[in-house]
């Protein structure tokens, strides 16, 4: 059974959720909630990422799941059982911390063997498990080193090995790649993802890096201000952001304020600041809110072709900034009476634009989304 | 040298040359401190070392006598020329008023020598001619004793082991062999042992009391930690004398501590705290607490909170996580703090003097007594050297045991 099948099963049969947050709220100071009304199921074998800006409550959520913080209100169920009373060491959850938290006074092998002694595994059996775990992260030769003698990437692998060695049912990772340089980070993303799939581990992963989330996850929960803004698979999240925050946090988006004039079929007619209209998809926006906008990604805007075609919005503006970036060109255009709209023009269409030159752009109606704040 | 080696040397020289101005600038910045340290720290210690083995008195006051003793066999009573030389030396000494100095120095090794030298000097003044030997012997039989002369001769050298030996409860017999001093004269090893014991006890108590405080300081919310830190530091901002005096007041038999103990019915009668070792240890522990706490705190603060969490998540119950993960990482601070308190405690002086009883005096108190009351700088320096050596030895021992990199003072 692959993951997708299991997930479709899971939705029918909610008991398959390994972790369930039920109306969880958390406040540290008794005044402000840093986690508000969290309801979330994590399915078995799933790679779920909590993505959000710093301070949005991701770590707090993870700490509650790990047993290091108590929910102020609500419940967390692990395997269907509430875990409020269960101390961290009894949860059998692997936790990879942001700074790895390797034990500096122990060798790499001792670090990895640490969780085994609490599970009654000692001597030759422990040695063998440590060897396997280090082999899995390609660190066979470094067992006698101290953590301080390792590079950041190697430390990260040790932390991974130490967590995987006791075969936890659930692994939590809090921005585990944050301290690594870009290249290494990308390699580790793939390695972690491969380990997770091949070992069938359930993973809850925290990051503020959207591309990391898109690369690795089965599902992404976008956090903002203590709430899940949207919970979906990467493609849905990217193509169909459910609000303006998600739209601008994942990838790049032009956000253009508007008012809703009416609907034609499934298409909304939006009036822009200068009175021109745009058509946009966005079935679930009521339009009564004051804070509505049309959102469209730069790569979905192109230079207008000859002749008018159906299914396209067309608008004009004056060129402001032009950057040539090799494979594409970024063109910022002032449109709708002062609104800056950025388009990503493929290199083969790139040409020179003078400052203030009139430019006509177009974008697909289905790629313009009507969003609320 | 090969060409490559010559090149390497040239490059090395070039680097040195290029960095010379920076080196000079750095040196000139450090120079005032270096001068200060040499004048105020290195020089006094060197002077202390010299004083502990220096032996100028006999050489300066009795040059002719020592000369005459050159040919003495060391076993019989010396002959007339020695006494004549002594008479001549003592006349000069009387004129220069250095006889008392000599008497005091010889008195350390031959009791009664001080008054004998002074009396003899007075007598010699009135004698114009010899023979002197009978007159000396008539004045005091002991002038004929070979042991007296052996000790005088022995002190003709510019160095003496006398003070160092005395500081270690040892003495040199007239025949030159080193032996242990007897009974109630053997006090200094006791004092040294007591000093080490009290310092060790104070160190232990500051650790037991300070370690949890340091831990709470690291985990408490900022505002509370700030207030706690202030309370830890406050004693450091008060003069040692003031704090000690405060303890004198508190520890009185009718003082607050006894009042409280009585009120709580913890004791039936008032406990003698002042002028006891208990009192000394209490007061010293209080004064030393910050010195133990601060290095531990600074090390604890550098341990990420995730260390304990990681241990817990891997399956360690709280106590196990503490002892196997947290405590070992605080060791550098513990060693630094304890070393600091222990070494500082070895030198305590005012507190034992004011709070302790006569049997609780530490090495420093004896040093002070020998300097201030007995004017015996040699013995004071000898004790100082012993204290210095013990301190260094303990320091080196710690370095050996835990490694220099494990000691973090900040
Ligand atoms: N131990 C704590 N005590 C008080 N406030 C905290 C604590 N940990 C986090 N917070 C606050 O909770 C909010 C969410 O923090 P966190 O969960 O760490 O967010 P994230 O991991 O998404 O950056 C932040 O405003 C942070 O200041
Ligand atoms: Mg965080």
Predicted regions and their residues:
Chain A
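ABC ATPase nucleotide-binding domains
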Residues: 47, 88-245
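Helix-to-loop junction immediately C-terminal to a conserved catalytic motif
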Residues: 66
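The feature captures the beta-strand-to-loop junction immediately N-terminal to the Walker
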Residues: 51-53
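Conserved ABC transporter NBD signature motif
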Residues: 74-82
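ABC ATPase nucleotide-binding domain helices that frame the ATP-binding cleft
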Residues: 59-62, 158
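Glycine/charge-rich catalytic "coupling/switch" loops of P-loop NTPases
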Residues: 2-6, 239, 272-322, 347, ...
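ABC ATPase nucleotide-binding domain
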Residues: 20, 41, 77, 360-362
């Amino acid at each position: 059974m692959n993951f997708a099948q299991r997930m479709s099963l899971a939705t029918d049969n909610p008991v398959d959720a390994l972790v369930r947050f039920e109306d969880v709220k958390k406040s540290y100071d008794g005044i402000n909630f840093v986690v508000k009304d969290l309801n979330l199921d994590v399915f078995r074998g799933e790679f779920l990422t909590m993505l959000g800006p710093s301070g949005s409550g991701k770590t707090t959520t993870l700490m509650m799941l790990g047993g290091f913080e108590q929910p102020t209100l609500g419940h967390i169920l692990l395997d269907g059982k509430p875990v409020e009373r269960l101390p961290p060491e009894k949860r059998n959850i692997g936790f990879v911390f942001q700074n790895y938290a390797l034990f500096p006074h122990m060798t790499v092998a001792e670090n990895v063997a640490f969780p085994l002694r609490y599970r009654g595994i000692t001597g030759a059996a422990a040695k063998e498990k440590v060897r396997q775990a280090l082999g899995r992260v390609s660190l066979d030769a470094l067992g006698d080193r101290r953590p301080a003698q390792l590079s950041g990437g190697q430390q990260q692998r040790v932390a991974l090995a130490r967590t995987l060695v006791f075969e936890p049912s659930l692994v939590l990772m809090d921005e585990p790649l944050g301290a690594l340089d870009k290249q290494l980070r990308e390699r580790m993303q793939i390695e972690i993802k491969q380990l997770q799939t091949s070992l069938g581990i359930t993973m809850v992963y925290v990051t503020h890096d959207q591309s990391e989330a898109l690369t690795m996850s089965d599902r992404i929960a976008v956090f903002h201000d203590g709430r899940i803004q949207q919970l979906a698979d990467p493609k849905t999240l990217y193509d169909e952001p459910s609000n303006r925050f998600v739209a601008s946090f994942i990838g790049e988006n032009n956000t253009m304020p508007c008012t809703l004039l009416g609907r034609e079929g499934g298409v909304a007619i939006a009036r822009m600041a200068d009175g021109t209209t745009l058509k946009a998809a966005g079935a679930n926006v009521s339009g009564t809110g004051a804070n509505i906008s049309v959102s469209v990604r730069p790569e979905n805007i192109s230079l207008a072709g000859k002749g008018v075609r159906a299914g396209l919005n067309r608008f004009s503006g004056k060129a402001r900034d032009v950057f040539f970036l090799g494979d594409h060109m970024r063109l910022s255009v002032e449109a709708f009476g002062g609104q800056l709209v950025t388009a990503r023009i493929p290199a083969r269409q790139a040409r020179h634009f003078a400052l203030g030159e009139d430019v006509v752009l177009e974008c697909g109606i289905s790629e313009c989304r009507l969003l609320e704040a | 040298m090969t060409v490559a080696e010559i090149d390497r040397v040239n490059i090395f020289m070039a680097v040195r040359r290029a960095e010379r101005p920076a080196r000079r600038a750095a040196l000139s910045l450090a120079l005032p401190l270096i001068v200060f340290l040499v004048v105020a720290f290195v020089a006094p210690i060197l002077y202390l070392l010299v004083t502990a083995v220096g032996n100028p008195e006999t050489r300066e006051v009795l040059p002719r006598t020592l000369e005459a003793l050159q040919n003495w066999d060391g076993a019989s009573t010396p002959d007339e020329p020695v006494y004549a030389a002594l008479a001549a030396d003592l006349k000069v000494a009387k004129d220069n008023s250095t006889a008392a100095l000599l008497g005091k120095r010889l008195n350390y090794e031959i009791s009664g020598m001080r008054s004998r030298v002074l009396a003899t000097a007075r007598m010699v003044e009135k004698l114009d001619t010899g023979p002197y030997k009978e007159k000396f012997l008539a004045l005091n039989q002991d002038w004929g004793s070979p042991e007296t002369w052996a000790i005088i001769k022995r002190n003709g050298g510019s160095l003496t082991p006398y003070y160092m030996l005395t500081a270690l409860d040892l003495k040199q017999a007239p025949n030159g062999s080193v032996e242990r001093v007897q009974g109630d004269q053997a006090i200094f090893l006791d004092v040294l042992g007591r000093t080490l014991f009290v310092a060790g006890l104070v160190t232990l108590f500051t650790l037991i009391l300070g370690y949890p405080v340091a831990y709470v300081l690291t985990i408490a919310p900022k505002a509370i930690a700030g207030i706690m830190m202030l309370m830890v530091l406050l004693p450091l901002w008060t003069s040692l004398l003031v704090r000690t005096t405060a303890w004198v007041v508190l520890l009185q038999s009718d003082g607050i501590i006894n009042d409280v103990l009585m009120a709580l019915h913890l004791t039936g009668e008032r406990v003698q705290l002042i002028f006891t070792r208990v009192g000394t240890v209490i007061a010293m522990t209080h004064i030393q607490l910050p010195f133990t706490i601060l290095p531990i705190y600074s090390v604890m603060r550098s341990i990420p909170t995730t260390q304990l969490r990681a241990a817990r998540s891997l399956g360690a119950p709280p106590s196990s996580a503490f002892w196997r993960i947290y405590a070992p990482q605080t060791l550098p601070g513990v060693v630094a703090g304890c070393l600091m308190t222990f070494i500082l405690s070895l030198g305590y002086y005012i507190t034992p003097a004011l709070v302790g009883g006569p049997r609780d005096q530490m090495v420093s108190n004896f040093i002070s007594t020998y300097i201030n009351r007995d004017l015996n700088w040699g013995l004071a320096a000898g004790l100082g050297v012993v204290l210095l050596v013990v301190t260094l030895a303990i320091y080196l021992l710690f370095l050996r045991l835990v490694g220099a990199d494990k000691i973090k003072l900040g």
